[in-house]
């Protein structure tokens, strides 16, 4: 499972002219389920995301998490994170999970986030979204959780 995490002062997602998700200070999380991902990868990614220390402490060091600062999470599905352009100029998205699997894993991830964090907003899976943000820093961190092999 892939995530592109951006520290923001504020962010919002608009679908068909209506705001469907909005946060103030916090993390904008672009999320992509890859082929082979399960709920386990989503759980591991969520734990990492909530503990990711990319907010400044009193000394100005990145030493605080979104939980520490009471920030929001805005989670937006983005299958294009699985793009592979190594074979030419047109990217392939074959590494992304099938749409039905992607939707299921996205919904499980958002539900899990809402169970563990007080302020969680989301985009709309599969919609044409406009994402507005004020980047803070900028700080952008890619995260990837690879499926663990099952014992034989």
From Swiss-Prot:
It is an enzyme of class 3 (hydrolase). Its EC number is 3.1.1.96. It holds the Pfam family Tyr_Deacylase. SUPFAM superfamilies: DTD-like. Its main location: cytoplasm. GO terms for molecular function: D-tyrosyl-tRNA(Tyr) deacylase activity; Gly-tRNA(Ala) deacylase activity; Ser(Gly)-tRNA(Ala) hydrolase activity; tRNA binding. Keywords: Cytoplasm, Hydrolase, RNA-binding, tRNA-binding. It catalyses: glycyl-tRNA(Ala) + H2O = tRNA(Ala) + glycine + H(+); a D-aminoacyl-tRNA + H2O = a tRNA + a D-alpha-amino acid + H(+). A motif (Gly-cisPro motif, important for rejection of L-amino acids) lies at residues 137-138. One of its GO terms (cellular component) is cytoplasm. The keyword Chaperone does not apply. GO terms for biological process: D-amino acid catabolic process. It is found in: Cytoplasm. A Gly-cisPro motif from one monomer fits into the active site of the other monomer to allow specific chiral rejection of L-amino acids. Belongs to the DTD family. An aminoacyl-tRNA editing enzyme that deacylates mischarged D-aminoacyl-tRNAs. Also deacylates mischarged glycyl-tRNA(Ala), protecting cells against glycine mischarging by AlaRS. Acts via tRNA-based rather than protein-based catalysis; rejects L-amino acids rather than detecting D-amino acids in the active site. By recycling D-aminoacyl-tRNA to D-amino acids and free tRNA molecules, this enzyme counteracts the toxicity associated with the formation of D-aminoacyl-tRNA entities in vivo and helps enforce protein L-homochirality. This is D-aminoacyl-tRNA deacylase. It comes from Aromatoleum aromaticum (strain DSM 19018 / LMG 30748 / EbN1) (Azoarcus sp. (strain EbN1)). The gene is dtd.
